[in-house]
């Protein structure tokens, strides 16, 4: 079964109410449906998932290719890693990936989305998804001398995405051999075309030209210096990707909340930005944060990578302890608390 079929199932389920989702996920699904209806027109020159040919003459479909790669990569922690199992994408992840990577310009074939803003609660496979995207941009995007950075303000955070990406490669010798990937202590490289994938603390140097910048837990950033430097450095790339992925936070005057506010305006149609992909999981304003429904709505991997027992017990603790409430709301329900 194709990954696009899984994505379509998810869109259908969200829009007909069978899948619990907040208004922003409904808006993202509706946006995809609207775009599919108007694709390839003068006002909207993008087409979804056409057959393409890479530099090596191989035919591929962009929406499937990203998912196929990630499905070949192994889990890096928990029960699935212990069983040496590969990643199995859920339909919400298929929607996320196929939409982000499947749209291309009808004339140039270049990717439509240059930026993604995603808010996903903790333990929903956020870093794993980011690591998989990093691998694709590093080894399969056809970018000569690709520069992929897992960027953060602290070393610990920069490694949150790079560590699983490095482990995936270490445990996939056939993949590394076929792509010529060298796995070093603190970076990965493809010698043949000069591509590299590495963690980055603070801003890249002046000579950096990122083809992909992954910014994990953006809510922790006090300023926009890192992201702005990344964006400036991307100017020389044909189809760069700035991938921002975060839980909610408490700094409502910081750059992440401003980006969120802008992304919501794109989802509601107040602003038009055809190159920004936004996916904001969470609960709606009138939802009861102490309900199981709230947990199911905010956590797309509820019962999969994030156990229902775990979430219900965290919720119970937060309900009984006022000083634990904010952490629970931001990390597990994506509620911003100022």
Cite the ranges covered by each PLM segment:
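Phosphate/NTP-binding elements of NTP-utilizing enzymes
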Residues: 2-338
């Amino acid at each position: 079964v194709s990954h696009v079929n899984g994505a379509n199932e998810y869109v259908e389920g969200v829009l007909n109410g069978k899948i619990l989702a907040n208004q922003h996920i409904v808006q993202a699904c509706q946006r995809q449906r609207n775009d599919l209806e108007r694709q390839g027109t003068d006002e909207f020159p993008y087409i979804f998932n056409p057959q393409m040919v890479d530099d090596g003459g191989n035919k591929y479909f962009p929406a499937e290719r990203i998912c196929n790669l990630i499905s070949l990569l192994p889990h890096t922690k928990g029960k699935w890693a212990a069983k040496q199992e590969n990643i199995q994408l859920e339909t919400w992840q298929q929607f996320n990936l196929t939409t982000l990577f499947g749209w291309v310009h009808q004339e140039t074939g270049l990717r439509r989305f240059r930026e993604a803003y995603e808010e996903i609660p903790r333990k929903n496979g956020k870093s794993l998804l980011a690591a998989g995207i990093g691998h694709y941009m590093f080894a399969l995007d056809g970018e000569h001398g690709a520069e992929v950075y897992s960027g953060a303000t602290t070393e610990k955070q920069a490694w949150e995405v790079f560590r699983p990406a490095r482990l995936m490669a270490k445990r996939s010798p056939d993949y590394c051999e076929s792509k010529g990937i060298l796995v070093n202590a603190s970076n990965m490289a493809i010698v043949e075309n000069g591509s590299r994938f590495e963690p980055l603390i603070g801003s890249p140097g002046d000579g950096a030209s990122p083809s992909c910048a992954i910014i994990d837990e953006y809510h922790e950033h006090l300023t926009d210096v890192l992201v702005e430097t990344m964006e400036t450095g991307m100017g020389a790339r044909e189809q760069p990707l700035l991938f921002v992925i975060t839980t909610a936070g408490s700094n409502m005057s910081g750059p992440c909340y401003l980006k969120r506010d802008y992304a919501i305006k794109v989802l509601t149609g107040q602003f038009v930005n055809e190159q920004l992909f936004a996916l904001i999981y969470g609960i709606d304003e009138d939802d009861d944060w102490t309900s199981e429904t709230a947990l199911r709505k905010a956590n797309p991997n509820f019962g999969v990578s994030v156990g229902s027992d775990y979430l219900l017990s965290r919720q119970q603790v937060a309900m009984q302890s006022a000083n634990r409430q904010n952490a629970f709301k931001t990390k597990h329900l994506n509620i911003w608390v100022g």
